[in-house]
From Swiss-Prot:
One Gene Ontology term, aspect cellular component: cytoplasm
The protein, known as: tRNA 5-methylaminomethyl-2-thiouridine biosynthesis bifunctional protein MnmC
Gene3D superfamilies reported for this sequence: D-Amino Acid Oxidase, subunit A, domain 2, FAD/NAD(P)-binding domain, Vaccinia Virus protein VP39
Gene Ontology biological process: methylation; tRNA wobble uridine modification
Residue ranges of the region described as tRNA (mnm(5)s(2)U34)-methyltransferase: 1-243
E.C. designation(s): 2.1.1.61, 1.5.-.-
């Protein structure tokens, strides 16, 4: 994976940004905003189409994000539409854009000063504008009414990675970028064909250029194109539409993802941070959600800790783990910051510092640093810099995550559910233990059985952590269970100076000023799957710190002898990635893929899955860093919205991936 380089800008005599790489302006010197409105909104008939649009979400694709002017302009127009048409079917705008050389945040802010009327929207974008990390960044705005998927990287690499189903995902294309004469590499038949693959039937397209090869290329890709009057003094531009689309999907048949059919009600089984984030994402999409939780209140399971570290799980090879956790961590930051505007919960973006405490950890972290991640995401610190960063003496180098920190998952989860409980389309049923799920073929509904009674729902999500084996449908999913104990230690004058979450062969949080305790942990115990206090784990948590930091007196001040602690059971996967998506029918999959290695690609059947049954499981010890994006992914899938990760990364999260990998190698999967 190539690293992302920021755009190199100059500013011409009228204050318009000019690309040094392409020697071209980002927008018209005369009136860039009016040009956007004319070329992309008017010629794509957007105002008229919104009036009669018959789906909940309208999706726009754009080939060059640049300054974000097109996005801000269409967002402004959409807000006007919503105010004027509160009862319209269309409720949500989704904007998917690509950018090889993203502007730095400072340059973006400067560019936006040209349009005071967009200042309020621009400020919202600035707040969540991502660092230069490759692939898709999902930014959810206006309580879910507006979504921006910003893909960072060369569009020739990104476009083939965008997942889509048989119907396509794009309702309108903004074919924008630097002029074809300035950036010939982008304007080619592969681009036009890629746009066509993502387009829905009746998808419209417009572009400022009138170049003949662009018009012919779009026609070859399947669009009906024509020349129209250009903006201002420009004589011509081109616009058109895709009249019909051939059904096709980018998902491999054995990693197929389907949305829920005939969706009118959804049951979520769980009560942790993943369930809360999922319920929020679904309710924002207008869905009716009922939560079933066996406990008296939320966050009684693995999400119940006082303080949890939030930072990405990265590696230098940029494998699936790194490609999931980099955007997931950044999405968690966004999710938490937005939640904090309305809710109260303990958290602090104080940074996370990972010590190079021995040769093995040093080699591992150096290998991670070889991945050339953006400095906003990760930095190497000398021993002196580490001491300054954490606020305590230390004689070790480290890796620092400046955007990381800690939060109280119990408080966040409970606050999210309390907020949801004020809404008409959310119901929480606590102390309701779901015993069985039965699919009623006649009504095409799931029966959710609890203590001698049942209710019916069109879709069900299993998000109950380590208790996933309660249900026959998920009993064979290859996930493990690990007990963890976190110790709570009282503040001392010295320990109160810790300014960053500290990671080593364990972790320690800064003192929470609201309770004058810090957290240190956490144990890993696969043998004793209970939630009883473990005196050995309590001692082990303290000893890990003194073993990794043997030469500092402050490490010995951590006092766990009061036996203050919390225990929970993690739901973990072998490959450290969650299981998110459709629940596979294990027995049927074994039969249908019994001879998978010898089956021709075109003859492979779509994987057998239970109808309208989904799971969000296996978040392990990094659930705080992954749950919000995994929930957003699943809500998007259930509701047939664009998905926020590359298609090959989605395969790494597929709930049936372990079975499929074995079957593709011709191995038996009696158990995993």
């Amino acid at each position: 994976m190539t690293s992302i380089t920021h755009a190199e800008l100059g500013w011409n005599e009228v204050g318009t940004p000019v690309s040094d790489q392409f020697d071209d302006v980002y927008f018209s010197n005369v009136n860039g905003l009016e040009e956007t409105r004319y070329v992309f909104l008017k010629q794509n008939l957007i105002p008229e189409r919104w009036q009669e649009f018959d789906r909940r979400r309208f999706v726009i694709g754009e080939t060059g994000f640049g300054t974000g002017l097109n996005f801000l302009a269409v967002w402004q127009a959409f807000n006007d539409f919503r105010r004027a048409n509160p009862d319209a079917t269309l409720k949500e705008l989704h904007f998917i854009s690509f950018e090889k050389f993203p502007l730095s945040k400072q340059d973006l802010i400067k560019a936006h000063q040209a349009w005071p009327e967009l200042a309020e929207l621009a400020e919202k974008l600035h707040r969540h504008y991502p660092p230069a990390v490759p692939e898709c960044h999902r930014i959810v705005l206006d309580n879910g009414a507006v979504t921006l998927d910003l893909w960072l990287g060369d569009i020739k690499d990104c476009l083939p990675s965008v997942p889509y189903g048989e119907e396509g995902i794009i309702d309108t294309w903004f074919l924008d970028g630097f002029a074809p004469s300035k950036n010939p590499e982008m304007w080619n038949q592969d681009l036009f064909n890629g746009m066509a693959k993502l387009a829905r039937s009746e998808c419209r397209v417009a572009t400022f250029t009138s170049a003949g090869f662009v018009r012919r290329g779009l026609i070859e890709a399947g669009f009906a194109m024509k020349k129209v009057k250009g903006f201002g003094t420009k004589r011509e531009m081109i616009a058109g539409c895709m009249e019909t689309r051939q059904p096709q999907s980018r998902h491999a048949p054995y990693f197929n993802r389907t949305s829920a059919s005939h969706l009118d009600s959804i049951a979520i089984i769980g009560g942790g941070i993943a369930s809360a984030a999922l319920a929020k994402a679904l309710v924002q999409r207008g869905q009716k959600v009922t939560l079933y939780c066996k406990h008296a209140q939320a966050a009684e399971g693995a999400s119940g800790n006082r303080q949890g570290a939030v930072y990405p799980l990265l590696n230098g090879s940029h494998d699936g783990v790194s490609r999931v956790f980099a955007p997931a961590f950044l999405f968690t930051r966004q999710f938490v910051e937005q939640a904090a505007q309305a809710l109260t919960f303990d958290h602090d973006w104080c940074g996370v510092t990972q010590l190079m405490w021995d040769e093995k950890s040093t080699n591992k972290l150096d290998k991670m640093l070889s991945g050339n991640f953006a400095p906003e995401l990760i930095q190497k610190l000398s021993a002196e810099e580490t001491a300054a960063k954490i606020g305590l003496p230390i004689d070790m180098a480290s890796v620092h995550y400046p955007l990381g920190g800690w939060l109280c998952p119990a408080e966040l989860t409970q606050a999210l559910f309390a907020q949801l409980d004020t809404l008409d389309n959310f119901t929480a049923k606590f102390e309701q233990s779901v015993e069985q799920l039965i699919w009623d073929e006649r009504s095409q509904q799931w029966q959710v059985h609890t203590q001698g009674q049942h209710d019916t729902y069109s879709a069900v999500v299993i998000a109950n952590g380590h208790e996933f084996q309660t249900f026959s449908q998920t009993a064979d999913i290859p996930l493990g269970q690990v007990k963890g104990q976190v110790s709570h230690a009282p503040a001392t004058e010295t320990l109160s100076k810790l300014k960053s979450v500290l990671c080593y062969d364990g972790y320690m949080t800064p003192v929470n000023p609201n309770n004058q305790h810090l957290c240190i942990g956490a144990s890993y115990d696969r043998r004793h799957l209970d939630t009883e206090f473990d005196v050995n784990a309590q001692q082990e948590n303290a000893e890990k710190l003194t073993q990794c930091v043997p030469n500092q007196a402050w490490a010995k001040e951590v006092d766990t002898s009061g036996n203050l602690s919390r225990q929970g059971i993690r739901c973990v996967s072998r490959d450290h990635l969650p299981f998110v998506g459709n629940v596979g029918d294990f027995s049927a999959i074994k039969r249908q893929y019994a001879d998978l290695p010898h089956t021709q690609a075109e003859e492979i059947e779509v994987i057998s899955q239970f109808p309208n049954l989904f799971c969000l499981l296996g978040l392990g010890s990094r659930g705080l860093s992954s749950a919000p994006l995994m929930a957003e992914l699943l809500a998007s899938q259930i509701c047939n919205d664009p998905l926020p990760l590359p298609v090959d990364v989605l395969e790494e999260l597929h709930p049936s991936r372990m079975w499929v990998r074995k079957l593709r190698k011709g191995k038996a999967i009696t158990e995993l």
